[in-house]
């Protein structure tokens, strides 16, 4: 079976958003991202294909907003970061023009030739560290990492003030979780503490708390909010906030270091609808888009968009923030070390 054929059985939902052809961009004056010349060229192309790892509960209504404003039909293909990375690589080698924009947290790991160099006008409004110097990707939301806790199981006064303090809580053994892919967090820990001290710190935490290694950050956040786990040793703050906004008893607190990477958008070098791709990339960096995503707990990369609830970014940035953007080789190295420390292999 060829590499391309293997994807025939993948459960990658291709979800076509409703087309609102009668929707005129009369509101362009209030939408700086909606360039009239680019819009006309994009509408002539007919549609937009999005590859995204964002869950459908957020992604579908977000791109329905794009469709309602522009009249451009969107095919939304949702899968995990790993599946999308593999799929895009195979399609690129096969010279397929299959998607227009990618929206995942791993675009910075893609070879430069797979992405078009493009600087959306709205990029000037996002933080400097969320802009790729090669103009291949831009941060749509900030993926801050911090521990989380079930507010009915653990009192705020009991929370550790440093990662060293975790080993003092033997009563939490077996009630602490961490996702099995948190290699970015591990790299930040060792960078902050130094390799020897950092490894000793993690080994102490594992020995005392015996963390449950989970599969899926959102599932872990939901399990923490439900009380299955009392503590998430680390998780994406936006997902913990998503569960909190749904009415569950979960909170976050910040420790040194706070790991940061980004949910990113990039334009395919082989986009079948290049003008629609550029318009959509600009939309993803707009105030309108980031305000929409903030309703789900996503943390904005724009200074003019407030987090939900307010003050989360300010709390996190009072600590030492370490931005982690790794190549595929670096990620494999840190994942091996993570597996050795947390899984004993």
Tell what function each PLM region has:
Residues 30-35, 43-61, 263:
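Extracytoplasmic "Venus flytrap"
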Residues 49-64, 75-228:
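Extracytoplasmic ligand-binding site segments that recognize negatively charged/polar headgroups
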Residues 128, 143, 171-181, 202-206, 211-214, 284-307, ...:
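Periplasmic-binding protein-like
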Residues 146-153, 190-192, 262-273, 292-295:
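A bilobed periplasmic-binding-protein/Venus flytrap-type ligand-binding module shared by bacterial periplasmic
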Residues 308-345:
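Extracellular/periplasmic bilobal clamshell ligand-binding domains
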């Amino acid at each position: 079976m060829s590499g391309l054929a293997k994807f025939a059985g993948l459960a990658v939902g291709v979800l076509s958003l409703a087309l609102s052809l009668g929707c005129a961009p009369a509101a362009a004056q209030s939408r700086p991202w909606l360039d009239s010349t680019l819009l006309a060229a994009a509408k002539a192309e007919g549609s937009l294909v999005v590859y995204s790892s964002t869950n459908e509960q957020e992604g579908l209504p977000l791109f329905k907003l794009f469709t309602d404003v522009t009249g451009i039909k969107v095919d939304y293909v949702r899968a995990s970061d790993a599946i999308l990375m593999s799929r895009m690589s195979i399609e690129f080698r096969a010279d397929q023009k299959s998607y227009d924009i990618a929206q995942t947290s791993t675009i910075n790991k893609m070879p430069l030739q797979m992405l078009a160099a493009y600087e959306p006008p709205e990029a000037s409004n996002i933080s400097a560290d969320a802009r790729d110097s090669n103009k291949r990707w831009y941060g749509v939301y900030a993926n801050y990492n911090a521990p989380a806790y079930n507010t009915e199981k653990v009192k705020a006064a009991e929370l550790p003030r440093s990662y060293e303090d975790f080993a003092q809580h033997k009563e939490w053994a077996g009630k602490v979780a961490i996702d099995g892919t948190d290699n970015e967090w591990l790299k930040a820990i060792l960078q902050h503490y130094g390799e020897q001290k950092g490894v000793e710190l993690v080994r102490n935490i594992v020995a005392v708390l015996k963390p449950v290694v989970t599969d899926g950050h959102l599932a872990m956040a939901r399990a923490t909010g439900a009380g299955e786990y009392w503590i998430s040793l680390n998780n994406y703050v936006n997902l913990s906030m998503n569960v909190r906004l749904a009415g569950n008893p979960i909170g976050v607190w910040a420790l040194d270091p706070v790991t940061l990477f980004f949910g990113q958008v990039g334009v395919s070098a082989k986009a079948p609808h290049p003008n629609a791709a550029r318009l959509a990339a600009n939309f993803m960096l707009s105030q309108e888009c980031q305000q929409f995503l903030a309703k789900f707990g996503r943390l904005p990369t724009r200074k003019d968009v407030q987090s939900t609830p307010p003050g989360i970014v300010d709390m996190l940035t009072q600590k030492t923030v370490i931005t982690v953007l790794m190549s595929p080789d670096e990620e494999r190295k840190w994942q091996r070390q993570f597996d050795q420390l947390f899984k004993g292999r």
